[in-house]
Each structure stands twice: as structure tokens, then as C-alpha cells.
UniProtKB/Swiss-Prot annotation:
It comes from Elephantid herpesvirus 1 (isolate Asian elephant/Berlin/Kiba/1998). The lineage of its organism: Viruses, Duplodnaviria, Heunggongvirae, Peploviricota, Herviviricetes. This is Protein ORF C. Residues 157-170, 252-264, 596-607, 622-640, 699-710, 841-876, 1096-1109, 1116-1125, 1188-1202, 1258-1276 have a biased composition (Polar residues). Residues 141-153, 190-206, 220-251, 424-449, 474-483, 529-541, 754-774, 894-909, 1148-1158, 1204-1226, 1233-1251, 1284-1299 have a biased composition (Low complexity). Residues 1408-1438 form a coiled coil. Residues 135-268, 306-334, 383-506, 518-653, 680-911, 949-976, 1013-1061, 1089-1299, 1454-1483 are annotated as: Disordered.
Length: 1483
């Protein structure tokens, strides 16, 4: 393997480690890397790690961890790492490095550079196997020396100096791999192999799971600085030279001293290095690692323990490396050493897990997940070494510390608690107690017990973890709290607080860094000691033999790890997991993984139970109340806390944790632990807020988390997921909710469906939009990976997560595509309405596909999708509409709310089905009204159905999605995708996305372009015009409104929802731009339909085709007119919607070139469609939608808009030319017609513009023609059914064609109906006759004071809207016409901008006029229908009704009132009069 020395060297050299090799820091990125960067090379490596991809780093770490080639990486550095517990032991023992698997997982968990990789553990496994083979085949010392003897040892010397250099590098490494590397001084090489074995055994015993490596380094740091202060260490230093050469004879104590002396005085010899590798933990209090792992099974690397660095540096300024500042410490991944059987009594159990020190945390889990099996030979060798080292230590000055030897040798079943030598001769029991206290603290910390504050007391109270029993049960608590506290307090009093950067990442407030604080709290170090001591106690019940590093540890560990809170403020520090920057439960949090004392104690499955059961009285006496509470909170949530039963669960937990880490690709243990801590805190406060990432979630503890969105089991349960969502929704903790929601969302992807629904915008919304969720997204990513590799949480981060991302992108897509579309297919009719309205169906798949934006929301959305996908999504859409307001109104609760309240979610994330439907509602305030969610299904009035064509053959409504699908597909712009068959869209996530995009475009272009005029015109008036308007061609631009369409429909939808909300709630926003027409449409009583028409007509024909009959009003006038006005306004006036349309139309024209053949036939109809779109608004759109519905509509919109802009720019060139022409008469008509034609084209389902757009030439001709002199109108006027001629006339004869247009629009509605606007025909016939001239003329007149008469054609378009949806569309058309009129002259455009708010009112007025034109009975019926619909909607969605929906309903009602008030006014109103009346109406 590369991990072998030669390959490793090459690899290191070839990779970031070239510089590292120079310094001898072999493994910078690897949390578990054999050697952490300990020199400037570490800086370089760290910097490179920063730049390196996480996968690269992970590979590096895996390679280094797999091959603890201290040789390549400066044996000394690596040895030091090992000394500090980075590795299990010497090269042989470095099979422990195959902890590296755990370390790899730990590294991931630690959030180090190690990238989330599902192969990380396999890598480590392979490396472990290779390492075992090599270790078995080669002498431990020789192999290690061979690997890095020449360069590594010397570089180690250099590294020791460079450790000072590392200060800067360490700072950077700490930031990057701080979790991975314990920035600490390189550990002095071990004295002898035996010492190494003993130290490694103790270290492994004490060593936390791989993530715990860092605590080891910390321990090493702590102990090394302490070593000089330790008298025993002096002996060790004296012996160190011997041990350097004599791997087997020198005592661990000698090694400990030797380590510093080697570091300080001479370059350590290979043997020294190997010994140090074996005994590196001698200096390091293993508790630290245990703490790291305890707190977080893999946290120790997280804890890389800058705190330890600080402590060690502080405590260890005597050593060469200790001298450098905290950042300078060796950035060695503290590879938690898996204690070998000889080393750890629990090694037997750990044997499976091979997690000696990790056994506590990682060993149990590792047995399942990371079966780090150290070769028996190595194990035996380690045992022998441990025994020899223990014997030597026993005979050494640190004889009390040597006490571990019996445990190492005599109590292999139990992790021998590394009895830290008391700096001042504290009893080994006392030392053990600290360690155990650490375990207790770890469990408590993990348990989330309130160890953070009052940690001193807490630790004292905790000192005896309920499961861990000190040798002297009654004495231990007090002793631990006292004696441990004494040395630790003394020791920590000198220790600098943990570097702020340590906590910067995790937001954990920097606290006086107390090495043992985290480890104590996390029971990392103490856990090891506890495991050893407790195990020994349980088996031998003798004070855990003081570890050779007990002196170092004692000062730190005796007081620090296990010391309750040496610092009075240890509590806070404990809270931040001193070592780990992760607030995750700070070491407490890991306890859920069984990483706490649970795991540590668990290594010997019986011991923890015995310890807990027996020592519980003593240890529990103090800590039990607290620890029991905390553990009860955590342990239950965890897989059983620190009890015996937890041992396997801990192991499973660790395994699960590591697996989860790998699967979910947690970038760092810290991230994972962060999630865990949050989850733990959540769980402690509320069991609901359990983090799926916690191993418990994966372990049997899931039942507790069943309501937890992060539960992997529940994850697979759609309904449970939904329940979880609801539970999360109910969960009061906002942060837990987002995390739960996000994890829940991720679980939804796991479920495959729930995500879409719960989160409507879950797809793109969550992580990308929500950073807080992004963390959860990563967590869910991993969670998803672990729980269900298929779709982790839909999330950009998921995409980043590689396999997880792929799964989300692909698997999620297919599940969403298959599941959501299939379910949507089940409710296709409803979904079609809903999707057409809210592009819910279309969006559902699309959101699933595009989970980036609403990934945070997505997880809930996915769950909702799962639960509500088929019929529920729609049914739930109604309930979402009603409920979504509540659950979705809060974004964080979105996951929970998603399932119920898509409306709210749509606001937040519109990606999901329910959210899509609600998104449409949000998008088009009218959409809410248009689509009254009844029983979760959008109850659309006839208009609504017409919008979708649902009434017209449920699919023609989705023509935009379906018919335009080919065009859109051909169109190639965002629209082509959107123009997917509704069925296809429903069937495929992409298709659904396309349909959703198509609907979005309709909504956005027609309604949202106007509505989004708020958003898009301002953000992207020109680009937004083309982009947003030309949804198909400029998907991103449509994505401005529908940018999410590209990024994620959800994302787009959310903006759309916001804009819609703005528009519906703030028509003025819509009025801000020509989108006022869409806004007016929204404001119109037709808002119910307006949702689609604004969105649909704007979106082009998606709405129109769907609801051609109903759509005309909405589509043509609302969309087209608004766009037309927007085009002109956008172009000349700053009416971004108009410009958008102009641009969009132009783009459409460009696109139609390909589409021209198809649009060629509709070209003649395009004019008619324009007129129809103007007059009917829906009439034109319907046929074009079928022909080239969505993409064409979108394209046509782009084309129409662009030509409009081209014409606007050419003729208008600010729309002046066209608008001026319209003003002039022919030109005025041309301008308005151009705007209207284009708008109509876009609006009227590409009636002329879109038909032309789709038919390329028509759009191009119509739009370009319209540009100059309504030549577009000429092309458009080329009536499909002779309507185009009238359109031409209208274009050329501005006033006459205006009237003609009105008439033509009426005729066109029919003609276009015949062509594409067949549905519009009936609508036109229904509405057009009454509305066309009067309504259109009035709006035009009111709109363009100078050129309003010529612009009557535009008002005609409005009439078309009125005809299609007289109540809603006419206002939109009026606005469009007004906007066009205003736009035609720049002055007028300015005027139109001014009237924008009035135009909205005018729109209402136009609508009123149209209604007036309509027969009184018909108008009354319409109004009654609208009111009924509003009442229905309000009833259905009143309680949780979305604000947008409510605003839309209110606006609709207001519009109805204004319409009725305006109705008396004859349709023929002076423009000024009409505008004032509109203003009055609107006001």
C-alpha cells in the first residue's frame, strides 16, 4: 500500500507531503495520519490541506493512517504522534493506526481535511491489513525505522524545532485539521519497544477512538511539558537514551523522559522514534484521546487539542517542541491508539474493534464498523511490551504509574485505565480516578450533562461515572474530584485557555483550555483510565496501574482529564470539549456514540456495567445525579450511555458513527460531533431533537429518536419521517428543528420522497440557502449516507459530499423522479393543476433534482414527499397550504412544516410538490386564489383548470410542461427542460423539474416577471428579462426568478414565492415593474387564476396551455401584457418585466430560429395570439402551449420579449420607437402591439410571440416586426386565422388595429383557439365579446395617456386577459397595456412606472372594466365564483394559510370590491379616468 514506507514516501512526496517530508511531517491531512505535520512542512502541508480537496486530504490521511509510516513522515514526528497517542504504538503496534480506520472516521468526524469518503474506512481497512502484514512481517522498531529512520528521525529533530515553526503551521493546520492533528509538540521517541508497547497499550487503552488521536497528542503535549516537571519523567529522560536504542528495556517512564530529552537534546534514534511511537502515549495522557473519542468517538482528532497544545506547550515548554506556541505544537493527528489486548484489558473486545484506547469509544464501535484488528502477533507483542513497560515502569520512578502494567498485562479484558502518574505522587487510584472521571465526564459531556459550567463540581460529581467504578468506589469520587482536580487545577491553572481558533470552527467559546477538561468531561482520557481503571476495578478492582504517562497525565490528566473541573471555569471549557473545538456535546456529545466513558468503560463490556453498577454508588453518588441525568439524556439517546449494554452499542455506535461518518461523508469529526452535540443537546432538552448523526440514531437507541428526523430507521419510513417532521415542527428548539429538519430532509432523501414534500424547497433550499441547515445538510449527507446511501439529504453539500451528493443528485432524483413523479402521477390531475399552478408536480421532481437550494428544507420536504407524494402531496398541498403557513412559515421548522405546509415551505423552499403548488400560490398571489387547495388538491376554477388546461383535458393545461417540453428541450434554454410533458415531467425528476420550470416560467414570466419584477426586474431587469423572462433560453435568468430552476426550482421557487408574496402582499412591488400587471393580475379578483396566468402567462404557455380557456385573461394580458409592458418598460422604461419580456422575447426569437419551423404555423396565429393574449390573455397561450407550450412559451417569451426589446430597443430602443410608434398611431399600436404582441406572445401562450417564438419566425418576425413598427405585429398579424392581419393592422394602424385588435383579439381568441388557442376561443367568446374593445381600450387609454388610443390594441390584450379571465387578467392586461403605453414613450413609460401602482389599480380597473363589459350576470357569477373561491381558500387555508395566500386572497377580495365599484363605470373609461379609477380601486 501507499501507506508502506516507500510508497508512502512517494505518495507523501508526490502529494502535499513533499514539503511535509522535508520536515518529516508525513501526514498532515490525516487526522489519524501516522505523523501529523510537526514542522513548517506542516504549515505547507496544512496550507495545502486547506487547498487540497477533502478527498485528497482524506486519502492522505487514510494513507498515512493506514501506513503509520513515521519513517516517511519523520519517524520522530510520527513517533511523537504515536507517543501522543496519535498511533496505537510502534510500527508494529501501528496496526493501531489501523485505528486509522477509526481515525479516518475520526478524521472525518473531526472535520479535518479528511474528506468525507465512503472509502475512507475501506482505505483504512486496506491500510490496516497492509500495515498488519507489514507489521507482522517486520520488526516494529525496524519497520518504523526503516520507513522513516534516516529522514524521519532527523526530520523529527528538525520537526521538533519545526514544531516551533509549526506554530504558524499548526495554527493553520489546527484550523484545517485541528480536529485531525493534535497540534502538539512531537513526542519524544519511546525508550524501548516494551515501553512503547506498554505506553501504546496504555495509550490504546486510554486512547479514544481514532478521532481521539488528537487528545493523545494533547496528552502528549500535556505530559511532555509536565514531564520535565515530573520527577519520574526525569528518570525517564535518563532512561530515554537507553530506550531510544533499547526498544524493549527502557521503561515507559524512561521513554517519557526520553521523549522530551530526545526532543530537546538529540535527534531521537530510530529505536527511540519507534519506542516513542509505541510509547508516545506514555507522555500523553490517554484520557485525552479517550476524551476525544469519548466525547466524540472521533473527537479527539477534533480535539487535536489545541487546548492540549496550549496546555502541553504551556506545561511542556521544556521540550523542544513544547517550546513553540500552541499553534506550533506538532500537528499530528492524534491517532487514537487502539489498545492491544496486552495493553488494554478490553482489547479482547477491542480486538474486534481494535480500539484499545479507542475501545472505549471507538473500540466498541470499531469492532462493528472499523474492525481494527491488530495482528495477534502485534497484540501479543504489544502486550509483552506493555507488560515489560509496565514492569519497567513499575520498577521505574513512576512505579505507581507502572501500576497499569498489571492492568495491561493482568487486566487485558478491560482497558487498563492509564493511571496517570500524579505529578506529585498522587495515588494511582487517584490518577485512575481522574481518568475515570474523565470517562464520567465524557459520558456526562456526551450525555450533554451540564458539565460545561460548574465542571469542576460537575466533574467531581461526575468523577465516578455511574458505570465506571474507581478502585475505591467511595474514595474515587472525592479523590478524583479532589486529587484529580488538584493536579489538574494546578496544572491547568498554568495551561493557557484553548486557542480561540479551536472553537472558532465550532462556535464553542474558548475557555481556559484544560486538556483534561474535555477529556475529563468527555471521559476521553479519563475514559481510558476509567476503562482501564474501571475495567481493572471491575476485574481487578485495583487502582488502574498508573500509566507511564500518568505523571504527565497526572498533572494534566489526574487533575485535568478526570479532574472534575480544575479550572473553576472548567465547566465552560468542558462544554466546548476543551480538546475539540466542537461544541458538539463537547465530549459529552460523543457520549451518545458511546464514546464517552460509556465507550471507554465499555471496552470491557462487563466493566462499564460493573463500574456503573458498582461504582455508580460512589461515582454516581456525585456524578450519577448529574451524569445519570446527562447520561440518561445522552446514554438513552446514545446507545445506552456508558453502561455495559452500551459497550456493544457503543461499539456499534462507534461503528455506526464511523460508518455514518463515511457514508454521510462528514467532512470532519468535528462536524459530525457538532451535529451530535447539537443533537445531544436537542435530545437532552427534547428527545425529539435527536441527531440522526448520533450513532444512537443508527443504533438501537433510534426508538428514542423515532420522532427525530435524523433517525436513520425513521429516515426510511416516509410516514415516520413525516411524523418526525411534524415532531420537529412541534419541537420547540429552533436549532434542533433546523438540524432535525435538515437531517429530516436528508432522511427524506433517504426515504426518497419525503424530502420533496416536506420541504418543497427542500431540494435547493436547505443547505445552500440555509447555512445552519447546511451544517445539517452535511450531517444528513453523512446521515443519509450512513442511513441510506441513496439520497442523503438533498443538498448542495450533499453534492459536495461526493457519493452522498451523487446519491442525492441521482438517487434522489430518481426517487423523486420515480417516487415523486409516480405519486404525482397518481395525483397528476391535481398535481397538474397544482403543478401548473405551482408547478408542484413539475417542481417536485425538479426540486428533487435540484435540492441544492432547499436542501435544508429539503429533508423535511423529502419526507413530506415520501409521505405525501402521490395523493398526499396535493392533498397535503391543501393541508400544506393551510398548515404550511404554520410549519412552513418558519423556515427552520420547514422540514416539519414542509410536509404539512408546503405553502409556507414554498415560501421557504418551493421545490417540493406541495411547496411547488404553494410556491405557485406564493409566486402568483393569484395562484393562491386560483388554486384553492381543497383537500390538499388545488381547486381551480374553470380558469384555473384552463390555466392548466386541466379542464381542457388535464394535460393540455400542462401543455406548457408537456407540449413545450419538446420545444423547450429543443430550446435548450431553461425553458426546454421546463417544457417537458407533464406526464414526463411528473415521471422524471428532471421532467418534473422541467414542468416545474415551465410553470415557474409561466408564473415567473407572466406573473413573476411582473411579480418578480420586484425581484427580477430590479435584480435583473434586462438579464432578468431575458433570463427570467426567457425562462427556457435563460434558465438562469428565468432562474433569477427561476434561477432556482437552474440552481433548483426550489430555490427559484422560494424567491418566486417571496416575490409572489411581495407581489400579492405588495402589489406595489409588482407595480414596481410591468410586473404590476402580473401583480395586478394577482391583485385582480382573478388572483386564483392569476397565479397561473401571471406565472403561466408570464411563464409562457405553461399556464395558458393548461388553462387556455381560463388562462387567456391571465396568460395573455397578465403575462404577455405585463411582459410586453415590461419589455417596453423594461427596455425603455425601467420596467424590468417589460425589458425582461423584450429581452426574453428577443432571446426567444433567437431560440425560435430552431423553433421557427414549429412556430411558423403559429406565426400567423402569433399575432392573433398576441391579440388573444392581450384580449384573452389565456386564449393565445393555450394553443401555443400545446404547440410549443413551455419551452416555446418560455422561449417565445424570451423571443417575444427580446424582439419586444429588440423592437423595443430598435423601435423603442427604450421602447421609445415601438412605443412611440404606438403613440404615433401605427407606431403606438406597434409599440403597444409589440409589447402586447410580444407580451401576448409570451402571455398568450406565445399566442403570437410565443407561437412565433416557438415557431421561431413568428416570434422573431412578430417581435422584430413589432420592434420597428409593430412589424412583429405584422408577423403576428399574419393571422393564423386572419387574426394576424388584424394584428398587423393593429401594428400598423395603431388606433384602428387597436380596435381591430380588440375585435381581432376576440376573433383571435377563437382563431388562436383554432390554432393553439382553441380553448381561448371559448374563453374569448365568453369574455372577449364583452371585454375586448372597451376593456382593452380603456386599459390602454388609461395606461398610455399619450398613446393610449393607439394602444387600445394592448388594452385589447388586456381584454383578452379579461376574456380569458376577465376578473384577473384584464387588470394585468391593463397594466401590461398601460405599461406598454407608458412604455411606448419613454415619458409614458416613466408615466407607466408611476402608474405602476395605479396600473395595478388600473389592472383592477381594467379587470373591473372587463367585468363591466362582461354581462352583469356573468360578472356577478365570476365575482361570486372568485369570492367563493376566496372563501374556500380562506376556509381551507385560513388557519395555516400562508401569508402570501392570505394576502392574495385579500388582494383578490379587494380587487373584487374594486371591480364591483369599478364595474358601474362603463368599460370605456378615459385612460386617465380609468387609471384614477384603477388607483382608487387598487387603493
Amino acid at each position: 500500500m501507499r501507506y508502506l514506507s516507500a510508497e508512502h514516501d512517494d505518495f507523501e512526496k508526490s502529494r502535499i507531503f513533499k514539503s511535509v517530508l522535508t520536515v518529516g511531517a508525513g501526514v498532515a491531512p490525516n487526522t489519524n495520519s501516522c505523523a501529523t505535520f510537526k514542522a513548517k512542512s506542516v504549515k505547507n502541508s496544512v496550507e495545502r490541506m486547506h487547498t487540497m480537496q477533502r478527498d485528497e486530504i482524506r486519502d492522505e490521511a487514510a494513507r498515512h493512517a493506514a501506513c503509520p509510516r513515521y519513517t516517511d513522515m519523520n519517524v520522530l514526528n510520527i513517533v511523537r504522534d504515536f507517543d501522543q497517542g496519535a498511533f496505537g504504538g510502534p510500527v508494529d503496534d501501528n496496526l493501531d493506526i489501523f485505528e486509522a480506520e477509526v481515525p479516518e472516521a475520526g478524521r472525518r468526524a473531526a472535520g479535518t481535511a479528511a474528506p468525507r469518503d465512503n472509502t475512507a474506512v475501506p482505505e483504512l481497512e486496506l491500510m490496516r491489513a497492509m500495515h498488519r502484514a507489514s507489521l507482522n512481517d517486520r520488526p516494529p522498531a525496524a519497520g518504523s525505522a526503516q520507513r522513516g529512520s534516516a529522514g524521519s528521525r532527523q526530520p523529527r529533530d528538525n520537526l521538533t524545532p519545526t514544531a516551533a515553526d509549526t506554530t504558524g503551521a499548526q495554527a493553520s493546520v489546527d484550523l484545517i485539521s485541528r480536529p485531525i492533528y493534535q497540534t502538539e509538540q512531537p513526542r519524544p521517541p519511546a525508550s524501548n519497544v516494551q515501553q512503547q508497547a506498554a505506553a501504546a497499550a496504555l495509550r490504546r487503552q486510554q486512547q479514544p477512538p481514532p478521532g481521539v488521536r488528537r487528545p493523545r497528542s494533547r496528552q502528549a503535549r500535556q505530559q511532555q511539558p509536565q514531564q520535565p516537571a515530573r520527577p519520574p519523567q526525569t528518570t525517564e529522560t535518563q532512561t530515554s537514551n537507553n530506550s531510544n536504542t533499547n526498544n524493549t528495556t527502557a521503561t515507559r517512564q524512561v521513554f517519557e523522559q526520553q521523549g522530551p530529552s530526545t526532543i530537546q537534546g538529540r535527534p531521537p534514534t530510530e529505536t527511540e522514534i519507534l519506542n516513542e511511537l509505541f510509547n508516545c502515549h506514555a507522555e500523553i495522557p490517554p484520557l485525552e484521546h479517550v476524551t476525544g473519542h469519548d466525547g466524540y468517538t472521533i473527537t479527539t482528532p477534533l480535539f487535536t487539542s489545541v487546548p492540549y497544545q496550549n496546555q502541553t506547550r504551556r506545561s511542556r515548554p521544556q521540550g523542544d517542541n513544547e517550546v513553540p506556541p500552541p499553534t506550533e505544537g506538532d500537528l499530528r493527528p492524534v491517532i487514537p491508539r487502539i489498545p492491544y489486548e496486552s495493553e488494554t484489558g478490553t482489547e479482547t473486545q477491542d480486538d474486534t474493534a481494535t480500539g484499545g484506547e479507542i475501545t472505549t469509544l471507538v473500540a466498541p464501535s470499531q469492532s462493528d464498523r472499523i474492525q481494527l484488528q491488530i495482528p495477534r502477533s502485534i497484540r501479543n507483542l504489544t502486550r509483552r511490551r506493555a507488560a515489560a513497560a509496565a514492569a519497567s515502569q513499575t520498577g521505574s520512578a513512576d512505579t505507581p504509574i507502572v501500576t497499569p502494567q498489571p492492568e495491561q498485562t493482568a487486566v487485558p479484558p478491560v482497558l487498563r485505565p492509564p493511571v496517570f502518574r500524579a505529578p506529585s505522587g498522587q495515588s494511582s487510584v487517584s490518577q485512575q480516578q481522574p481518568i475515570q472521571t474523565s470517562n464520567v465526564i465524557t459520558t456526562d459531556t456526551t450525555t450533554g450533562t451540564s458539565a460545561p459550567s460548574g465542571d469542576n463540581d460537575s466533574r467531581r460529581a461526575w468523577s465516578p461515572p455511574p458505570w465506571v467504578r474507581r478502585e475505591s468506589s467511595s474514595n474515587e469520587p472525592s479523590r478524583q474530584s479532589q486529587s484529580v482536580i488538584e493536579p489538574d487545577e494546578q496544572r491547568y491553572a498554568n495551561l493557557p485557555p484553548p486557542p480561540d481558533w479551536l472553537f472558532k470552527r465550532h462556535g464553542v467559546p474558548p475557555r481556559p483550555l484544560r486538556v483534561l477538561t474535555s477529556i475529563d468531561d468527555m471521559s476521553s482520557g479519563c475514559d481510558d483510565t476509567m476503562t482501564q481503571s474501571g475495567t481493572t476495578s471491575s476485574t481487578t478492582r485495583q487502582p488502574p496501574p498508573p500509566n507511564p504517562f500518568a505523571p504527565s497525565r497526572r498533572p494534566q490528566s489526574s487533575g485535568g482529564r478526570c479532574r472534575p473541573p480544575q479550572n473553576g471555569s472548567q465547566g465552560p471549557q468542558h462544554s466546548d470539549d476543551d480538546d475539540s473545538p466542537y461544541p458538539l456535546g463537547s465530549r459529552r456529545q460523543p457520549v451518545p456514540y458511546g464514546t464517552g466513558s460509556v465507550t471507554t468503560t465499555q471496552p470491557s463490556g462487563q466493566l462499564p456495567s460493573d463500574d456503573r453498577g458498582r461504582p455508580a454508588p460512589e461515582r454516581r453518588q456525585q456524578p450519577t445525579s448529574r451524569q445519570t441525568v446527562a447520561q440518561t439524556n445522552i446514554i438513552p439517546n446514545t446507545s445506552g450511555g456508558a453502561d455495559d449494554d452500551n459497550t456493544p452499542p457503543d461499539r456499534n455506535r462507534l461503528t455506526t458513527f464511523l460508518d455514518e461518518m463515511k457514508r454521510t461523508n462528514w467532512e470532519t469529526v468535528e462536524e459530525y460531533l457538532n451535529a451530535i452535540e447539537e443533537d445531544r443537546q436537542r435530545r437532552e432538552t427534547e428527545a425529539e431533537h435527536t441527531n440522526l448523526l448520533l450513532p444512537e440514531s443508527h443504533t438501537g437507541v433510534t426508538p428514542q429518536r423515532s420522532n427525530n428526523p435524523f433517525m436513520p430507521q425513521v429516515d426510511l419510513d416516509t410516514i415516520p419521517t413525516q411524523d418526525r417532521q411534524e415532531t420537529q415542527r412541534q419541537r420547540p428548539s429552533p436549532k434542533p428543528k433546523p438540524k432535525s429538519l435538515r437531517e429530516y430532509r436528508r432522511r427524506d432523501p433517504l426515504t426518497g420522497m419525503g424530502r420533496s414534500y416536506t420541504d418543497g424547497s427542500t431540494t435547493s433550499d436547505g443547505d445552500s440557502s440555509d447555512n445552519s441547515w447546511s451544517d445539517e445538510s452535511r450531517r444528513p449527507r453523512r446521515r443519509v449516507g450512513s442511513t441510506l446511501v441513496r439520497p442523503p439529504r438533498s443538498h448542495s453539500a450533499e453534492d459536495a459530499s461526493g457519493a452522498g451528493g451523487k446519491i442525492k443528485g441521482t438517487a434522489r432524483k430518481s426517487p423523486h423522479s420515480s417516487r415523486a413523479p409516480a405519486q404525482q402521477g397518481a395525483g397528476t390531475a391535481d398535481l397538474t393543476e397544482l403543478a401548473g399552478m405551482a408547478s408542484l408536480n413539475l417542481k417536485s421532481p425538479s426540486p428533487r433534482t435540484k435540492l441544492t437550494r432547499s436542501s435544508s428544507l429539503k429533508s423535511p420536504g423529502t419526507t413530506t414527499r415520501d409521505t405525501q407524494q402521490t395523493s398526499h402531496p396535493l392533498t397535503r398541498s391543501a393541508s400544506l397550504s393551510s398548515k404550511s403557513s404554520n410549519p412552513f412559515m418558519p423556515r427552520p421548522p420547514d422540514s416539519g412544516g414542509s410536509s404539512d405546509g408546503n405553502t409556507g415551505s414554498s415560501q421557504t423552499s418551493v421545490s417540493t410538490l406541495g411547496i411547488n403548488a404553494q410556491q405557485c400560490k406564493f409566486r402568483v398571489p393569484n395562484a393562491h386564489k386560483m388554486f384553492t387547495m381543497v383537500n390538499g388538491k388545488p381547486r381551480l376554477p374553470r380558469m384555473r383548470s384552463a390555466w392548466y388546461s386541466s379542464d381542457d383535458g388535464g394535460e393540455s393545461g400542462l401543455e406548457c410542461l408537456r407540449t413545450p417540453a419538446p420545444t423547450r428541450k429543443t430550446g435548450g434554454r431553461g425553458g426546454s427542460k421546463i417544457t417537458v410533458d407533464v406526464k414526463k415531467i411528473m415521471a422524471t425528476a428532471k421532467g418534473s423539474q422541467q414542468a416545474k420550470k415551465c410553470l415557474d416560467k409561466i408564473i415567473k414570466h407572466a406573473g413573476e416577471a411582473e411579480r418578480y419584477a420586484l425581484q427580477q426586474p430590479s435584480p435583473e431587469p434586462p438579464a432578468g428579462s431575458i433570463s427570467a423572462r426567457a425562462a427556457p433560453p435563460p434558465k438562469p435568468r428565468t432562474g433569477t426568478r427561476s434561477a432556482s430552476q437552474d440552481r433548483s426550482n426550489t430555490r427559484e421557487t422560494v424567491p418566486v414565492a417571496t416575490d409572489l408574496i411581495d407581489i400579492s402582499s405588495a402589489p406595489s412591488s409588482l407595480t414596481q415593474q410591468v410586473s404590476t400587471s402580473a401583480s395586478q393580475t394577482t391583485c385582480d379578483g382573478i388572483q386564483l387564476f392569476s397565479v397561473a396566468p401571471p406565472g403561466g402567462s408570464t411563464s409562457q404557455s405553461v399556464q395558458k396551455p393548461s388553462s387556455i380557456p381560463l388562462q387567456p385573461i391571465v396568460t395573455g394580458p397578465s403575462t404577455m401584457t405585463s411582459q410586453s409592458v415590461t419589455d417596453h418598460d423594461g427596455s425603455s422604461v425601467t420596467k424590468k418585466p417589460v425589458i425582461s419580456q423584450g429581452t426574453f422575447k428577443h432571446t426567444s426569437q433567437s431560440q425560435p430560429s430552431s423553433e421557427q419551423p414549429a412556430p411558423g404555423e403559429p406565426q400567423p396565429d402569433d399575432q392573433l395570439r398576441d391579440f388573444i393574449a392581450e384580449l384573452e390573455g389565456t386564449d393565445v397561450p393555450a394553443p401555443p402551449v400545446p404547440e410549443q407550450p413551455q419551452s416555446t412559451v418560455t422561449n417565445t417569451q424570451t423571443q417575444d420579449v427580446l424582439p419586444s426589446q429588440g423592437s423595443s430597443k430598435t423601435t423603442q430602443q427604450t421602447t421609445s420607437s415601438t412605443q412611440k410608434s404606438s403613440k404615433t398611431g401605427s407606431a403606438p399600436t406597434s409599440g403597444p402591439k409589440s409589447a402586447l404582441s410580444k407580451t401576448k406572445s409570451s402571455t398568450s401562450d406565445t399566442a403570437s410571440g410565443k407561437s412565433v417564438t416557438r415557431k421561431g419566425s413568428a416570434a422573431s418576425s412578430t417581435d422584430p416586426t413589432t420592434k420597428p413598427t409593430r412589424k412583429v405585429s405584422i408577423n403576428a398579424t399574419e393571422p393564423k386565422k386572419g387574426s394576424k392581419s388584424s394584428t398587423k393592422q393593429s401594428t400598423k394602424t395603431s388606433t384602428q388595429p387597436s380596435d381591430k385588435n380588440n375585435i381581432l383579439l376576440n376573433a383571435k381568441v377563437v382563431t388562436i383557439d383554432g390554432d393553439r388557442i382553441n380553448i381561448a376561443d371559448s374563453n374569448i367568446s365568453v369574455f372577449a365579446p364583452t371585454q375586448p374593445t372597451a376593456t382593452a381600450t380603456q386599459p390602454v387609454t388609461s395606461e398610455s395617456t399619450p398613446a393610449l388610443p393607439p394602444q387600445l390594441s394592448i388594452p385589447q390584450g388586456q381584454q383578452s386577459v379579461t376574456n380569458i379571465f376577465a376578473p384577473i387578467v384584464p387588470p394585468t392586461n391593463t397594466l401590461s397595456a398601460q405599461a406598454t403605453s407608458c412604455t411606448q414613450p419613454l415619458e409614458q413609460r416613466v408615466s407607466l412606472n408611476q402608474p405602476d401602482n395605479p396600473p395595478r389599480r388600473r389592472v383592477v380597473s381594467s379587470f373591473a372594466e372587463q367585468i363591466r363589459n362582461l354581462e352583469v350576470d356573468e360578472l356577478k357569477i365570476l365575482r361570486q365564483q372568485v369570492r367563493e373561491r376566496i372563501a374556500n381558500e380562506r376556509q381551507q387555508q385560513d388557519s395555516p394559510m400562508d401569508v402570501d395566500r392570505r394576502l392574495a386572497l385579500d388582494t383578490l377580495e379587494d380587487m373584487l370590491v374594486s371591480e364591483e365599484s369599478a364595474a358601474p363605470t362603463p368599460l370605456p373609461m378615459d385612460t386617465g379616468r380609468f387609471t384614477p379609477k384603477s388607483d382608487v380601486d387598487m387603493s
